[in-house]
Amino acid sequence: PDVRRRAYIAKGNCDSLKDRLTEDESASVYLYTSEWEPRDQCLYVVLNSVLRSQDRRKSIPPWFLFLKLLLTALFKLRSCSMTVWRGIPLDLRKQYEIGKTYTWWGFSSCTESISVLELDQFLGQEGKRTMFSIDCFNGKKIRQHSSIESEDEILLLPGSQFVVKSYFQPSKKDPDLFIIHLKQVEPPFVLLEPPSKDIFSSEIPEGK
């Protein structure tokens, strides 16, 4: 709801060209990162819910135009090799076995700064929490186009694959926090085509 108005506002905040992106491409990143209430209606929440669903093939067609614009923007940004951090307010150790490879089908928001995750609006410092320490090679720095520049957000693309290297508890004083170390790997087949082609490869399987 209200997406057209928010898209108009996003374009108004992207009046200068950066990173060779057009105004519309920059605005797509701005709109993707925008927050509003209720949170479950934010564009990035709804879109990622579709991308991560079992029946994404049936649900994704209405998103094709926006996805092509957003992916065109992200493919123009330089891919960065770095260690990034992602936080989830759950204990996910049982879902990630050491040595196994996992595919993330949604856009994955990460940060360069671990201190950002410690803020209350993200992971906080209480309750069950999992931090992912991710050695990635195609992180996209979107700060110049984000609606919240202070977060230093790094976006990982759909279809990214990771091997679980280890997990550990960083402090006995905080038994609810665990860190899972992931290393990004190249999948055996292309799972995400450049936006000049079909957005998703026909090889994408259903589910995880």
Q: Where do the language-model regions lie?
A:
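Active-site and NAD+-binding cores of ADP-ribose-processing enzymes
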Residues: 89, 101, 109-196
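Intrinsically disordered, low-complexity linker and terminal regions at domain boundaries
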Residues: 198-207
